[in-house]
Amino acid sequence: MTATWEKKEGNEGVLTVTVPAEKVNKALDQAFKKVVKQINVPGFRKGKVPRPIFEQRFGVEALYQDAVDILLPEAYGEAIEETEINPVAQPEVNVTQIEKGKDFIFEATVTVEPEVKLGDYKGLEIEKQETDLSDEELQESIDHSLSHLAEMVVKEDGAVENGDTVNIDFSGSVDGEEFDGGQAEGYDLEIGSGSFIPGFEEQIEGMKTGDEKDVVVTFPEEYHAEELAGKEATFKTKVNEIKFKDVPELNDEIANELDSDAENVDEYKENLRKRLSEQKATEAENTEKEEAINKATENASIDIPEAMINTELDRMIQEFGQRIQQQGLDLQTYYQISGQNEEQLRDQMKDDAEQRVKTNLTLTAIADEENIEVSDEDIDKELEKMSEQFNISVEDIKSTLGNTDIVKNDVRIQKVIDLLRDNAKYVEATKED
């Protein structure tokens, strides 16, 4: 077999492949054995028609397509290896010759992985993230935990405040006409949650139990129901009941409830500070890594084939489908609820998909440029880490993966990211006013 690669414009080229006549004849033999099983010819049992009779009756051409199907995958795979190209999509194949006793020749128009022109990736200016945990952050976490232990208590007197939960009846109308979905009785709404139309919750504040009020709001221009988008609506609203959160004070008993390893408040705070400090340090490291990756990617120049973006979009749609499946939904149900279709969702995700592809290509190119290698020891360490993280044996992980190529690539990319951080110039983060 011979193969030649001719680069064309952009990321496309033509792969011309010639398979010797000897292999063609063998493929025709295989094709005949397959096809003859389905043929009925008077005077012969099914599947027992001699080859000469078959060709005389149907022509050898009847075997050509099956022969191509037999020859093409292997020949294309060998041609890719021989020419050392990296296809990123299925090729467009044009068979130029398939004939008994002659070479099989085909041309494949192939989109290949693009060239990456790296920019600066060392000495990148990165904001140094704060890792010290403040007393305010510690207290905020404590307050958040205590809020989960709060009981909802009916507010007998007083008005609605931010954070209260109100039980309301409402009936919405536009231009005096009620609209679908605009009415409810006994609806619980947490004020400040932002779950209603902008401006609605703010107007409920100050009302008391039994109060009635016309709440006037304007639907957002991008509202999912097009017939309501941008229109002013009036909601006749009645407050049935007001509840507030009765948050307990922190004591030794509650400290132990929040952290079974803590016997008193001081131990709880000490354990929490340690845990939050570790978490903040990890978040700071990840933020610095992300900034380094983004800057190195931004500095690179790549003409990304549309096929690579589409492949990444397919992967992202699949991942999204798996996430919403965990919430009891499927993609078709999501499309109905959101008013979107797959094409719109793909358009929405396209920029992220392109960024993902560019990032991956950039980091891989840096790994190649820096001759970064991954040892068996590196892979074993990563597998041990995965084993601890997911509580699965290393053997089971290997069995699930089939091979360690994915792990090897992940470790290689992580080494690139470490290289970016180690060679970065750190500056103090800009203080927010």
Swiss-Prot record:
Keyword GTP-binding: no
Catalytic activity: [protein]-peptidylproline (omega=180) = [protein]-peptidylproline (omega=0)
Predominant location category: cytoplasm
Gene Ontology molecular function: peptidyl-prolyl cis-trans isomerase activity; protein folding chaperone; ribosome binding
Gene Ontology CC annotation, any one: cytoplasm
Subcellular location: Cytoplasm
EC number(s) on file: 5.2.1.8
Recorded domain comment: Consists of 3 domains; the N-terminus binds the ribosome, the middle domain has PPIase activity, while the C-terminus has intrinsic chaperone activity on its own.
Record PANTHER family: TRIGGER FACTOR CHAPERONE AND PEPTIDYL-PROLYL CIS/TRANS ISOMERASE (PTHR30560), TRIGGER FACTOR-LIKE PROTEIN TIG, CHLOROPLASTIC (PTHR30560:SF3)
Protein family: Belongs to the FKBP-type PPIase family. Tig subfamily.
Protein name per the record: Trigger factor
Source organism (scientific name): Staphylococcus epidermidis (strain ATCC 35984 / DSM 28319 / BCRC 17069 / CCUG 31568 / BM 3577 / RP62A)
Organism lineage: Bacteria, Bacillati, Bacillota, Bacilli, Bacillales
